[in-house]
């Protein structure tokens, strides 16, 4: 099995990033068979689809790399690298744009969500970035791609592109990847102030999220003030229906402690959230405090972060080279 996945270097990482992607990667790495390979990359080319500050982007790349390592990604067991350091990503993306169909991209719901009412002002990169995502995984002959529900459509696009290319040029060049979806009860962590909105760094209220750099005291304050409702904890998951804030806190506790929604409710049903929140705070502090300390250490050694990313890029290029060389040969191109 070869797993490939990327994350944009956004900076200001929060609990949603940790539970939604990073810890899933760590579990996959730690549970891997000896023959499995895992490639995790910082998707800095994807970050260019919106306006960027180059200096901030460079800082965010190091920050994200440090956070991944602090969370448990081991560069000796997984290949960790910066997307733009492997030029084959961009090369293959252009090749695949010539295979992908406009109708396929027009159906991508994330472009509609991200461009909003300003579709005419959105960049071409934002429209076409699912093709770059396809290149990211097809380049390495990925067999499995861990994605959230909101990204499943893009993996289906990658499969369609791989199948069309293989069929058009009578080749078996590209492995058709399988999506690996889910994994954890809090894959979608919601805002602490609005249970219907995802936890996000773009929310103007810092009280809406748990940052990975938050102190123990800040975590306690945010959970204490997190929005809930006056009803007690139910005994069954169905009792959380129509209670998004309650469901969010229960889901976070389950994910952080390795339990399930059912087990959390079995232990805490009948309690008010005033009694439940201290337990949630303790669980979050136990998870984040050691990660935060390790992150601070890594921040102080930028040269080591750069070395790890460079070594990872060297390994990634070795795996990428056969695919791009064969793609050019099949197309009649010279490289």
Identify the function of each model-found stretch.
Residues 10, 142, 205-207:
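Short, solvent-exposed beta-strand edge segments and adjacent coil->beta transition regions
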Residues 116-165, 169, 191:
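Internal, conserved structured core segments that host functional sites
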Residues 60, 88, 153-154, 245:
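An acidic site on a long C-lobe helix of protein kinase domains
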Residues 65, 72, 100-103, 142, ...:
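A generic secondary-structure signal for well-formed alpha-helical elements
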Residues 102-106, 139-146, 254-264, 292:
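Short helix-capping/linker segments at secondary-structure and domain boundaries
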Residues 15, 153, 159-335:
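Conserved nucleotide- and phosphate/pyrophosphate-binding catalytic cores
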Residues 2-135, 283, 296:
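N-terminal Rossmann-like or analogous alpha/beta NTP/dinucleotide-binding catalytic cores
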């Amino acid at each position: 099995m070869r797993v490939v996945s990327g994350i944009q270097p956004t900076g200001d990482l929060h609990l949603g990033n940790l539970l939604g992607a990073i810890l899933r990667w760590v579990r996959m790495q730690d549970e891997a068979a000896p023959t499995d390979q895992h490639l995790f990359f910082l998707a800095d080319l994807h970050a260019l689809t919106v306006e960027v500050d180059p200096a901030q982007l460079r800082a965010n790349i190091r920050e994200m790399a440090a956070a991944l390592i602090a969370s448990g990604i081991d560069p000796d067991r997984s290949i960790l690298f910066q997307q733009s350091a492997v030029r084959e990503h961009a090369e293959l993306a252009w090749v695949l744009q010539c295979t992908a169909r406009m109708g396929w991209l027009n159906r991508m719901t994330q472009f509609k969500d991200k461009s909003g009412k300003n579709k005419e002002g959105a960049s071409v990169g934002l429209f076409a970035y699912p093709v770059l995502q396809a290149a990211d995984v097809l380049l390495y002959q990925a067999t499995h791609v861990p994605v959230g529900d909101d990204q499943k459509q893009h993996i289906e696009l990658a499969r369609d592109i791989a199948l069309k290319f293989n069929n058009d040029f009578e080749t078996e060049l590209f492995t058709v990847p399988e999506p690996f979806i889910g994994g954890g009860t809090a894959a979608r962590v919601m805002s602490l102030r609005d249970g219907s909105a995802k936890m996000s760094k773009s929310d103007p209220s810092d009280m809406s999220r748990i940052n990975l750099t938050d102190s123990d005291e800040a975590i306690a304050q945010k959970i204490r003030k997190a929005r809930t409702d006056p009803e007690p904890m139910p005994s069954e998951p169905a009792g959380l229906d129509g209670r998004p804030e309650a469901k969010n806190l229960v889901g976070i506790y389950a994910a952080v402690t390795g339990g399930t929604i059912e087990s959390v409710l079995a232990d805490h049903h009948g309690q008010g959230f005033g009694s439940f929140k201290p337990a949630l705070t303790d669980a979050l502090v136990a998870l984040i405090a050691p990660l935060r300390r390790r992150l601070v250490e890594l921040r102080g050694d930028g040269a080591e972060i750069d070395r790890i990313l460079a070594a990872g890029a060297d390994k990634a290029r070795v795996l990428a080279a056969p695919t791009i060389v064969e793609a050019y040969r099949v197309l009649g191109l010279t490289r």
